[in-house]
Amino acid sequence: MENLLSVENAILITGPTASGKSALAVELAKRYGGAVVNADSMQVYDTLRVLTARPSEEEMQGVPHHLYGHVPAGAAYSTGAWLRDVSALLPALKAAGQLPVFVGGTGLYFKALTGGLSDMPEIPEGLREELRMRLVAEGPEGLHAELEAIDPAMSASLNRQDGQRIVRALEVIKATGRSIAEFHRRLGPVLIDADEARKIVVLPDRAVLHARINGRFEKMLQQGAESEVRALLALGLPAVAPVMKAIGVSQITAMLKGEMTREEVLEKGAAATRQYAKRQMTWFRNQMDESWERLAP
């Protein structure tokens, strides 16, 4: 990391889960007098600190950390909401003389941060909840048929099984009377100039990454992941709530119901994490251009 000599307005660090990027963010924040800003869509929630690998106080090493655990578990939180939070945070960091060090595995956050994002409308919570419940009851194909009737062009561009995007498209057209495609064509402001930021994508060797993932999931169970899932289930959130999709929730839930042993939870949880990391690695390789420094720790 000795070649990190020129840092202008920000440091951006991404990479797959368990790649060591959070520790790198702390190291660089300490070196440059910075503050760490979360760019992971699961670590924003106020539950599942252990299961989402949110940094502990010890791991933060006294470095300021922002946008971690600030969203209630059942709340909707989009890329647009994250950008608004970042926009509100940046002036305070600048006033404090702290360099923002963004770190996380949500690639879309980084794309929006440096390229802008469509200014999407606010959706009434009642409408959002209604469509989520219908997705559970009817499945994605039923909602896709409804979208096809009122927004055929948009429906044609979506996979019939992609329930999340189908629901999002229905939310927008029902709330505004306009296709989500119209909003996609209008980009909001760019918050970070990519040409003046140090950009790093951490891509460990696959064997190294898999070993880290296997050890991490076992450690999570030892540190209280089971209790976190119990507390989450007690909230009675719908299965389609984003936080319910965190890796490990379904496996630990099955164990709590007596449907899976601890050994099976370890095996299946680690396997799901490895699959997720593989998808992340593919996305980063395809989406992060040559201006992103590849780091193989």
Curated annotation (Swiss-Prot):
Under Enzyme Commission nomenclature, its number is 2.5.1.75
Q: What does this protein do?
A: Catalyzes the transfer of a dimethylallyl group onto the adenine at position 37 in tRNAs that read codons beginning with uridine, leading to the formation of N6-(dimethylallyl)adenosine (i(6)A).
Which species expresses this protein natively? Rhizobium etli (strain CIAT 652)
A molecular function (GO) term? tRNA dimethylallyltransferase activity
Which keywords has UniProt assigned to this entry? Answer: ATP-binding, Magnesium, Nucleotide-binding, Transferase, tRNA processing
Q: Which domain of life is it from?
A: Bacteria
Instruction: Give the gene symbol.
Output: miaA
Which Pfam families does the record associate with it? IPPT
Return the HAMAP family for the record. IPP_trans
Site residues by UniProt (Interaction with substrate tRNA): T106, R128
Protein name as it appears in the record: tRNA dimethylallyltransferase
Q: Gene3D superfamilies this protein is in?
A: 1.10.20.140, Crystal structure of tRNA isopentenylpyrophosphate transferase (bh2366) domain (1.10.287.890), P-loop containing nucleotide triphosphate hydrolases (3.40.50.300)
Subunit note: Monomer.
What is one Gene Ontology biological process annotated in the Swiss-Prot or TrEMBL record? tRNA modification
* Top-tier EC class: transferase
